[in-house]
UniProtKB/Swiss-Prot annotation:
Keyword S-adenosyl-L-methionine: no
Molecular functions (GO terms): asparaginyl-tRNA synthase (glutamine-hydrolyzing) activity; ATP binding; glutaminyl-tRNA synthase (glutamine-hydrolyzing) activity
Name of the featured protein: Aspartyl/glutamyl-tRNA(Asn/Gln) amidotransferase subunit B
PANTHER family found in the cross-reference section: GLUTAMYL-TRNA GLN AMIDOTRANSFERASE SUBUNIT B MITOCHONDRIAL AND PROKARYOTIC PET112-RELATED, GLUTAMYL-TRNA(GLN) AMIDOTRANSFERASE SUBUNIT B, MITOCHONDRIAL
Amino acid sequence: MATQWEVVIGLETHAQLSTVSKIFSGASTQFGAEPNTQACPVDLALPGVLPVLNRGAVERAIRFGLAIGSTIAPRSIFARKNYFYPDLPKGYQISQYEIPVVQGGQITIQVPANEKAGKDAYEKTVNLTRAHLEEDAGKSLHEDFAGMTGIDLNRAGTPLLEIVTEPEMRSAAEAVAYAKALHGLVVWLGICDGNMQEGSFRCDANVSVRPIGQEKFGTRAEIKNLNSFRFLEEAINFEVRRQIELIEDGGEVVQETRLYDPDKRETRSMRSKEDAHDYRYFPDPDLMPLVIGQDWIERVQSGMPELPAAMQQRFADEYGVSAYDAGVLTSSKAMAAYFEAVVAKAGTANAKIAANWLMGDVSSQLNRDGIEIDAIPVSAAQLALVLQRIADGTISNKIAKEIFTTIWDEKADDEGAADRIIDAKGLKQISDTGALEAIIDEVLAANAKSVEEFRAGKEKAFNALIGQAMKATKGKANPQQVNELLKKKLG
């Protein structure tokens, strides 16, 4: 049924900019304060006060525009978006309409494979229409007041960058891949903390369907304020099914705004969707046009961090890691910094093993404890020493994992923790050929049946003998030496 239809998705993402004060006032943007304690006369729309643009918000918008290869408008205009809502004190929102500060640009996404649908992973470039500055509204609180609604204006005036894509995504998977890539980028650039639980990064999804081959877009529904990647995927998938079923049953899709109910996993109608003319946009007479000279852009450019794509290429060139590994290592700025700190201590020759550890044991432990890489209890220097001891043959990879877990659990603060634990527990790898031969002779004598099976052509028996040898040495034998000596003795 659904194969007759093509899905069309465009996303509008609100990224809360990481400024200390609001976009048009000096009030704090700190999250979690008591209601209405961070709202000044400008935020409250008291008579006789005027907005003053926050330079830091503009610079963050420029930084984003440079990162996505967009055009930074030399002159842009703030406009009043007129609508009534209890948590919008002025009766209008200051935004940008005809001339946004960021125009165009693109983001390349990696869409993961979908085994159930028989689809391989692929890369896609999503074009952006624009990104514009605007202020956030306050918040209506319905749960804490019986029969009433409370209004908290702490959030009113918080700076937002609204990032709008072209309607180029064709599945929920693509939309989620884009949202994750955008989230990673704004956090990497330091322009947004990306905290989705606090509403710092939230998406509106515009979803429509059309018969395959039809050029004209179908009627779209906008799903508002999706603040998790899972909710984004679920909401889009439900909305696609709803629209297809509605059309195939002879109905028509209505242009409207919908909300997603995560408990019922369905979208429901919120209000009819307005068009731009319904908001009666006009230039805000209280704000001068925003003029951005080339010198300002160059100053922002000089302070830009190395971007993920450039860093991925450098990791591949300098450290010899694969393109996939480089992508994982640059999934966050903190992960990339930790990797480079480990390599700086362990040496470039150990870069590949460092990458394997970060994507394997380190990531596993982070997931186990539910923490991010910037909160890891094992320092880069401590992990580097563990890797050096593997490389110089002091310990086996198995023992290294045991040492790493010990350092993690005891939250050791000494840089030489690995050597201390090796000495205290007697974990040095047995590499003495004579000692290993004696142990292997005992293993062969005690496992005559496995020896016979191996000589009869059963390869699994050889692995069993290796396991017995490692067990006899409590994992301290050099696995490569054990392998070679066993082969030699078994003929």
